[in-house]
Structure formats: C-alpha cells, structure tokens
Amino acid sequence: DTSQGGRSRLEWVYSSIPNGGPDLVVIEFGGNDVLRGFEPKITQKNIEAMVMFLKNKKTKVLLTGMQSPPNMGSNYAQEFNAIYPNLAQKHNIPFYPFFLEGVGGVPSLNQKDGIHPNEEGVKVIVNKIGPYVVDLLFGK
C-alpha cells in the first residue's frame, strides 16, 4: 500500500484495537510510493502524520526505512532516502534503517515479482528487526 493509504486508515485501525490501542506500531511505508514515483515530500508528509498521530496517543513507534531504487535517479534517491532518518531524528523515535535489509535484490528471498519477500525473505526480516521490536516492548 502507499503511505497515503496507511495514513487514511490509521485512525480507524487504531480505534478498532481493544484496550486503547497497540503498545507499539512499526511504520513501514514508502516502498510503493517510490515505485509509483510519488514526490518524496508527499511520502514524508504522510509518514510524519502517522508518527505524530501515534505519539499523541502515547504509542511507541518504530520507523523503518525504505530505499529508492537507482533507476529513480540520484536526486530523487537522495531526497527519498533522507525521509526516514530525518523523521526519526526530528521526532526522537527509534529507527531501523532499511526494512528489506538482506532481502532486497536477493532473488531467492523474493516472490516472482522481485519486489515482495517470500516466506524465507520474511524470516530474514523478522530475524533482523525482531530484536528492535522486543527491546521496544520489553526493554533490555
């Protein structure tokens, strides 16, 4: 989905979770935005709105980054790739630099579309990001 789709559903999804909402939300948006050539400023605006909504609800947030493929051009990639670390710093939230670390571009870990992780790819992602999630939920 796009960051706009996530933003438009966040309040509804949040309110449907019992006991006042989730303890932690992992924000992982932007991949479809970049593939559709959305302006990075639009993606940033949508993700920042989600971060602010969750912070206002006192919900822990883990922001995960995406990266622009090289075919989008260096200027686009530079602007897009900066969204995530900039927002994490601005809002003082934990940041996992690249959601698809170790999976992106590895054919054996992706579905036939070459973009979305397959079952083995998901295992790699969970093993890499899992410690961040556990630490945020339960501390070290």
Please state what every model-predicted region is.
Residues 1-3:
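Short beta->alpha junction loops
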Residues 8-140:
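Alpha-helical cap/lid subdomain in secreted, periplasmic
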